[in-house]
Every structure is written in C-alpha cells, then in structure tokens.
Amino acid sequence: GVVREGDFLLHEDGSYSLSNGDEDVLEVIDGSEMLITRSLQNWHTHLPMTLNRSMGEGMALMDWLQTSIFPSERNLTPELASIGTRASVAEMISGGTTFACDMYHFPSAIAPIVADSGIRGIVCGPTTDWPPAEEGEEDSGNAIRELESMIRSGPLGSGRVEIGIATHAVYTCSEEVLRKASEMSRELGARLHIHTSETREEVAQCHEKTGMYPIEYLDSIDYFTEGTVCAHCGWVTKKEMRILARNDSHAVHCPVSNQKLACGGTMSYPAMIEAGVDVRLGTDGAASNNGLDMRAEAKTASLIQKHDHWDATILNPLETWQLATKGSSDWVTWDLTDIRMRPRGRGSRRVLSNLIYSGTSCLDVFVDGIAIRRSGKTLTLNEERVSLDLEEAAQDYYSEI
C-alpha cells in the first residue's frame, strides 16, 4: 500500500527516517491515531481576496470582474490587504497548506504576514500602480520601484518567502509591461506569475489582436523565464503545451474556480504530462473558489480529470496527492479517529483515498522543523481575532459599492 506504519524521525531539513527507539529527539509525538503526510502547496491564489469571499455570486467572469471585483479593489489599502492576507493564511494553515504563490497588490503588506505566520510563499507584486493611472496620465512608477527594492532586499522569514513579479494577464497588460516584467525577472532572478488562457474570450481576443494564442504570444515576445507560474491554462493547444515545457514553466490547475466561473475549458492533465509540462495545483482566490482548502482542490482535480476524459484511472489517489503536495518538504498530521476516515481497510489501504475524497481534520503542521499548528490549534496566528478583524474590515471595504 501507499501508507507505511511505524515510528518515524522527522528531521529539520524535511527528510525522515525510521526510528530505532533510542535516538535523542526534541519531542515525542503519539501518532498512533494520526496520518502524517507532506503538506499541501497552493500554487495560485490572491491572499487578500478573502475580503471578496462570496461577492458577486452567479456572474460570468468578465462581468464579475468589471462590476464586482475591480470596483471594490479601488478601495483596497495596505491595511485591508494585510487583514485579508492574515485570514487567508490562517485558513490555509488550518487545512494543512504551508506554501502559497500569491498574486496581488501591495506585496509589502502581504509578504511580512506570510513570513511571520511560519509558512512558505512566493509573493508576486505588480509592476504598475494601483489604482491604475487615469486615462491620459502616466504611471508613477512607484509600484515597480517598490517591487524592485523588495526583490533586491532578498527573501523574508529565514528564506521561506520570496518576492516575485505579477503580470495579471495578456488582456490587462500591454506588451511593454510584459517585456519590462520579463527583463526585471532575468535581471533580478525573480519569479514571474501570470493568468493564461483562462477563458475562451481571452483566447479569442488575443488571437484576433495578435494572430497568436496567449502562450504563443507570450513566447513571441520572449516573456517566459525559468519557473514562470501560469495559472489556469484551460484553453491551451498542444503547441502551447510544448512551449510551456520548453520554458520550464509551471501550469497551475485551478478546477474549482474554473467551474464556478463557468470558464468552460478544463486543463488537460494527461496532455500536459505527455508534453512534459510541470503541473501544479492552486485554489485561485477566495473570491472565486470560495475557500482555500487544497485537499478539496485535489479532490476536485481528480474528479474533473476523470470526468472530462472519460477515464476513471486518471489521477489515482497517490498521483493526486503527489500533485497537491509537489515540492513540499514540510509535514502535516491528520486525525484518523474522524468517522470520515473509516473504514481504513486492510493494511490501511483506504486511508489516502479517505483523506482526499472524504476528508478529516488537520491536527499538526511543521515547517522547517518548527510546529506552527498543534492539536488543531494554530500557534502563529490568533484565529478568532483574525476572523473578527476580517468581518469588520469587509464592512469598510464595501462601504462605497
């Protein structure tokens, strides 16, 4: 089976080994009723957008953005971004997620919170002002100067939190902005993060304007740098998949958000793997998910891939969990006494399937060998205070909408 039973030593560097029972250890944890796994990794999200959770329900993507999200974001301040981020991080830790690749405004407000929480992250900030310059006015350049300064200052949280560069999408960023971001990425060694081929409309508009599909277009302007994070990739040709593979890019599957916004296209996981693309999993923001539960995202990814390809063998439990935890060096323990984890089956052979498709409570979270959650309680954030702050902040955020 895929589950091993026994006594294990967890090492600070993220490795583990079998215990002989006589080692000098910092702490002994009774894991007899626990399942320990690698932690979940959220490769595309917008952390402050817990402020927008359940806002503008039942709208098409572009209508939702233009009438709900973008107008509210004009009220966004660094303080509000901090409050939303703190809530998102608390939610992720409570669900066993220890990494987030974020894309949003005010990275200088977001990154310290991610670092202080004890998790890992890539906090990607924009290169243009927010709110944007009025028509006819020039961008002040403040955003890109601040972002460059943050990148040059180096990672936060003992190296756990990097700063990256966000370019929203081909339909919101000019060629000049995209080229500048790519140059900055090469010069500073910072990660690029972009939405790609999320909707038919986006793809059709790009093709009409440039004669190319979005990923082809980005390749034609030499946008990609190593490790570029491409969110969604729901309407992608096989040629574009080969471009992603050639550029060592990550294609991030966000199935819950795509279904909720009726984007229509589902990333073809088998075709991506066949093309050699590195696929990751993400929730998108709480505005379009509406949660940040990566276990639920893994379940949804497995189900939609089986359904769309008429093939129940795609993304079996082990492959699904490997997709959701890819790159993790941290640990999470799960409650095996929860009724949702029964029956375990002979040799605990049903445990991983139960975890993915049924669920249970996250008990402990360890990052860099340090506990940030124990016995179901997060140690680095006051969840009750965070929750109340979010509720209060939302009232101000929507006051003029």
Which sequence ranges carry the predicted segments?
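Alpha-helical scaffold segments that flank or form the walls of functional sites
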Residues: 53-119, 143-157, 391-399
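C-terminal helical cap
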Residues: 85-92, 250, 258-263, 305-345, ...
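Metal-coordinating catalytic core of metallo-dependent amide/deamination hydrolases
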Residues: 109-239
